[in-house]
Regions:
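Patatin-like phospholipase
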Residues: 1, 5-226
Length: 226
């Protein structure tokens, strides 16, 4: 990790202290910018008491000592997006969303998704657990209400294989998900989501076995206006 004080550069080799924030504090830093690459070694807790901005990536950056041009290019792009996100210039957790897209996201996804999920759970309560299981990989990352509201769309996009490199508008991320996800596979869960369906124990049991596929169906159902 590189830690900067004024115009001088101090280098720590990692392993025993992957983010040497204490070193920066001892050098006289008054504010810290930390980059956590989730590398091999020990990451000590931040006990400096200094204002700290930490840049982290949701995505697996690959083996830290494997130097491949394609991986390096991808990681540089992700790092650029993560840094902008850390300073509030971009939204999203797994995907980089343009700032100012809140209204569009609420109209196209957040509100209709919440309505659909409430309706489905009222008929089949176990679906709440199924959705929770699908979103579990994002839990520790979603620390704000906005992040939690967007988590189903972002997780579904991840499961569909949408490229995280790139800055998306609300419509672009929704459309990228629709292009990548399997509509035919999602359709088998639609009976659970239709108002007239009633309680469907068989479909609910299947969804519990494949929560990611159920989440994909939920998101597709909303975005295609089924």
């Amino acid at each position: 990790s590189d830690v900067y004080k004024r115009q001088e550069e101090y280098i720590d080799g990692g392993w025993s202290d992957n983010m040497p924030l204490g070193l920066a504090a001892r050098m006289g830093a008054e504010e810290l910018l930390a980059v956590d690459v989730d590398g091999v070694g020990v990451t000590l807790p931040n006990l400096t008491g200094l204002p700290t901005t930490c840049v982290r990536s949701y995505w697996d950056l690959g083996p830290i000592l494997r130097f491949e041009p394609a991986t390096a290019k991808r990681n540089i792009a992700l790092g650029y997006q993560d840094c902008y996100r850390a300073f509030g210039r971009l939204a999203g957790t797994a995907y980089a969303l343009r700032a100012g897209e809140d209204k569009k996201l609420a109209e196209r996804f957040v509100r209709p998704y919440a309505r659909l999920l409430r309706s489905a759970i009222s008929r089949s309560p176990s679906l709440a657990l199924t959705e929770g299981a699908a979103l579990r990989p994002m839990e520790r990352w979603c620390t704000t209400e906005q992040a939690r509201a967007l988590a189903p769309l972002e997780r579904a996009a991840e499961l569909a294989g949408v490229d995280p490199v790139g800055i998306y508008t609300a419509d672009e991320l929704c459309d990228a998900f629709l292009q990548k996800s399997d509509g035919e596979a999602a359709a088998r869960f639609y009976p659970l989501l239709r108002q007239e369906a009633g309680w469907r124990p068989m479909e609910a049991a299947v969804s519990a076995a494949v929560p990611g596929e159920f989440l994909t169906a939920l998101v597709r159902f909303v975005l295609t206006g089924q």
